[in-house]
């Protein structure tokens, strides 16, 4: 239980002066507390269980404190997914660093497939990813910023590879969406049929996506023959 917040907030919005109350500026610490509480609800019970009242109860904050940091529940939900995406991007970029564009794209694919195959990553991100995917149908505007963030490093490498001539003439944004669709389909299939061989799925998905980008067969073979990458985040949620 967060016992220090009521003391911090006892003057919330109460800097009185002639003409009324002066609005306080957002506090990054309180913003983080609200976001953390909301993320825990979404992660454990889903978006439908999230409410402003529940967040205020768990954080011991008042209504003014909430609306000083978020305009609405929808903005809070969008912020939860964006925060999750930013943490995921840190992990993906670690995997993609010091690689040429072809290997970086393969590393992004491999990193996202960790949702299905890496127990520690899956335990932290699976529920949030499922919730985000569900919201793509119910309320796409809430998760669009999060998806753009997760796709950003992939789009950057696709753009670079296109400029260097390592890919065929491609539309990086469109190809990133297509690659994400292939990866997510295989993640869901593995969750439904867990006996499938992870190594074979990784190889097949990477090969399929790289072929679609126009990568030469010998370059694909070289990528697939590389030793398994060191996976930052194994044994942790990041």
Residue ranges of each PLM-predicted region?
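C-terminal peripheral helix-coil segments that are non-catalytic and often amphipathic
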Residues: 1-18, 148, 152, 156-163, ...
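Amphipathic, non-transmembrane alpha-helical scaffold segments
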Residues: 27, 31, 77, 81, ...
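Short hydrophobic clusters on alpha-helical segments that form packing/core surfaces
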Residues: 30, 34-42, 50, 84, ...
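Helix-turn-helix
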Residues: 33, 41-75, 79, 83
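Hydrophobic alpha-helical connector segments
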Residues: 79, 93-121, 175-179, 202, ...
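Amphipathic alpha-helical packing segments from all-alpha helical-bundle domains
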Residues: 89, 136-164, 173-178, 185-188
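Secondary-structure edge/capping motif, primarily at the C-terminal ends of alpha-helices
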Residues: 95-96, 123-133, 186-193
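Amphipathic alpha-helical segments used for helix-helix packing
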Residues: 116-138, 155, 222-226
């Amino acid at each position: 239980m967060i016992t220090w917040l009521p003391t911090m907030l006892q003057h919330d919005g109460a800097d009185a002066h002639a003409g009324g109350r002066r609005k306080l500026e957002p506090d990054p610490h309180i913003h983080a507390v609200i976001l953390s509480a909301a993320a825990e609800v979404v992660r454990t019970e889903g978006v439908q269980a999230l409410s402003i009242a529940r967040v205020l109860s768990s954080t011991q904050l008042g209504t003014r404190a909430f609306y000083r940091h978020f305009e609405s529940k929808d903005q809070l939900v969008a912020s939860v997914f964006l925060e999750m995406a930013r943490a995921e991007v840190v992990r993906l970029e670690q995997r993609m660093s010091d690689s040429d564009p072809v290997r970086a794209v393969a590393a992004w694919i491999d990193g996202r497939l960790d949702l299905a195959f890496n127990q520690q990553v899956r335990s932290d991100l699976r529920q949030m990813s499922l919730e985000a995917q569900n919201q793509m149908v119910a309320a796409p505007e809430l998760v669009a910023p999060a998806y753009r963030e997760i796709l950003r490093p992939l789009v950057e490498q696709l753009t670079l590879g296109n400029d260097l001539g390592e890919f065929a003439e491609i539309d990086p944004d469109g190809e990133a969406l297509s690659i994400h669709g292939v990866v997510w389909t295989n993640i869901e299939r593995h969750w439904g049929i867990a006996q499938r061989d992870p190594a074979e799925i990784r190889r097949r998905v990477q090969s399929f996506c790289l072929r679609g980008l126009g990568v030469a067969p010998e370059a694909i073979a070289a990528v697939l023959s590389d030793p398994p990458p060191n996976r930052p985040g194994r044994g942790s949620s990041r």
